[in-house]
Design a protein with these regions (language model features):
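Pyridoxal 5′-phosphate
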Residues: 1-240
């Protein structure tokens, strides 16, 4: 019996809270059978790069072995099958977010690429010298660097929504900060450092009342809570 099989055999009944079987969840991730410095691996960096459960690894392995082909670029059997699977994945994401249609789902490499895409399009069409972008001081770099680049290229102004000593955004300041020059508000749904869950629905309502679109960085939120993009009414909701 190999080390992985022995580890699986040791997986016992639920050891966490009711309905939350920690050992069963760990058993689904092959990498967690490793030991580091003589102790079981505990991985806490999923916000940056998540480990893959066995089902994902096996699905990717199967696709590369038996189904790989161009998507939306061929008429042969493998290409058609790959396209169907690709669009099925888009529909799965749509259901996950309760988006209005699969056409609203745009695949990118990661959240940074998604925000770059929005920033570049707005920069070409909407944002010029002196126009404003409202961010918060609790943003991940993925939601800071693209706007810094846009500021350097276009001469835009970055404005920063402050937070309290308790790590909560001062939402009352937002209404005052938004002016006729404000082109977008870009805010994290959940802080990757503090764990603060921001009232993004209220933020979106305030911005929309002044005709300003909103981008929400949901990278931390989507794995910790249900997200309904139709209920939030965000213009852009990105995650990785």
């Amino acid at each position: 019996m190999g080390s992985e099989a022995r580890a699986m055999a040791k997986a016992g009944p639920a050891s966490g809270a009711a309905g939350y079987d920690v050992e069963r969840i760990r058993a689904d991730f092959p990498i967690l059978y490793r030991e580091v410095h003589g102790k079981p691996l505990v991985y806490l960096d999923s916000g940056a790069s998540a480990q893959k459960p066995r089902s994902v690894i096996e699905a990717m392995d199967h696709a590369y072995r038996f189904e790989y082909a161009n998507v939306h670029r061929g008429l042969h059997h493998l290409s058609n099958a790959a396209t169907e699977n690709f669009e099925a994945a888009r529909e799965t994401v749509r259901r996950f977010l309760n988006a209005g249609s699969a056409g609203e789902i745009v695949f990118t490499r990661n959240a940074t690429s998604a925000i770059n895409l929005v920033a570049n399009v707005l920069g070409q069409k909407e944002i010029g010298e002196g126009d404003e972008i409202v961010l918060s001081i609790m943003e991940h770099h993925a939601n800071i660097v693209p706007w810094h680049f846009l500021r350097e290229r276009q001469g835009a102004v970055l404005k920063w929504l402050p937070m309290s000593d308790q790590g909560e955004l001062l939402i009352d300041e937002l209404d005052r900060m938004i002016t006729k020059r404000t082109k977008i508000v870009a805010i994290t749904h959940m802080s990757n450092v503090l764990g603060t869950v921001n009232p993004v629905k209220d933020i979106i309502h305030i911005a929309h009342a002044k005709g300003v679109p909103v981008l929400i960085d949901g990278s931390q939120a989507v794995v910790h809570m249900p997200v309904d993009v139709r209920d939030l009414d965000a213009d852009f909701y990105v995650f990785t």
